[in-house]
Amino acid sequence: MVTLHGUACKLPDTELENLVKGIISEDDLKHAKVGLGDDAAVVIKNGMAIVKTIDVFTPIVDDPYLQGRIAACNSTSDVYAMGISEIIGGLVFLGIPPELPVPVAKKMLQGFQDFCRENDTTIIGGHTILNPWPLIGGSITGVGKEEDILTKAGCKNGDVLILTKPLGNQSAMALSRVTEEFEDLIDIPKEEQKYIFEKTIELMTTSNRIALLHLRELENELGEKIANAMTDVTGFGILGHSQEMAEQSDVEIEISCLPVIKGTPELASLFGHALCSGKGAETAGGLLISTKPEYKDKLIQKFKENNVYAFEVGKIVNNGVGIAKLSENVEILEI
């Protein structure tokens, strides 16, 4: 029904910049602590940080309940990527084809709401339209302390980058859409294909709130902030989102490791995806944390003790450059 699935349907970042250029001025954003260019907008009101974001996308799986969970995971992630763990509610946007049975749409909503409940929040309203193809997402509002806000702009020279989920779900989900007539082109045993699909669903429905809470737990134990900047890895790939961090922090980032779901490099090559060049689109990807080097081992240990993936994927190597690049001998680490 659709040709672009999940976060792969996002408008490319360069086109997005051109779209909003000249429309929203700096004066328009004078009351916003964080405006365009970050994971979410932040307004400070009476000492409280109000975090607003919206994410809507096309289906990435056939199962409507799972699609709802994935959409909720992806929509809420931008609030968590700003360092805020409390979401006060979400307004769900739903596009329904006229021929789509109501029970299918209800399953999408149920998946979205169940994910919200598991993360101590809820659907509080929304908007539904008739549309030629299904759409689901939401406008999410988080609240927290101003000092807890993390943006893409805080990277420091010498920082280490930690990623909390492996990459590759674009290629993994493309595998699930291969029809019987083309199955012979996939030189991966059925058991491995099953692993790829199940691991990908697990990752796309694992909330980034879990990693954020353990980051905050470690900071409380140490009595010090250890994350300088943070984002999540979604439609622009790890290199694209690292580039955003590099530009906003005015630093040079070098990505030395690409942790990927086992089997996805082969699939990416087959499907023409840019996974191994760091530009593969991710849906509901992990947090990318720029942390002080003296705390990286403690952070990795904290994550691993709590069943959160933790990969050291790169570092900040220079000031005043504003560019992200892959190492010449970048490691492809299959998980």
UniProtKB/Swiss-Prot annotation:
The record marks 10 as: Important for catalytic activity. The active site is at 7. SUPFAM superfamilies: PurM C-terminal domain-like, PurM N-terminal domain-like. Binds 1 Mg(2+) ion per monomer. Mg(2+) binds at residues 39, 78, 232. GO terms for biological process: selenocysteine biosynthetic process. Its EC number is 2.7.9.3. Keywords: ATP-binding, Kinase, Magnesium, Metal-binding, Nucleotide-binding, Selenium, Selenocysteine, Transferase. The keyword NAD does not apply. GO terms for molecular function: ATP binding; magnesium ion binding; selenide, water dikinase activity. ATP binds at residues 10, 36-38, 55, 78, 126-128. CDD domains: SelD. It is an enzyme of class 2 (transferase). It catalyses: hydrogenselenide + ATP + H2O = selenophosphate + AMP + phosphate + 2 H(+). Its cofactor is Mg(2+). GO terms for cellular component: cytoplasm. HAMAP family: SelD. Homodimer. Belongs to the selenophosphate synthase 1 family. Class I subfamily. Synthesizes selenophosphate from selenide and ATP. This is Selenide, water dikinase.
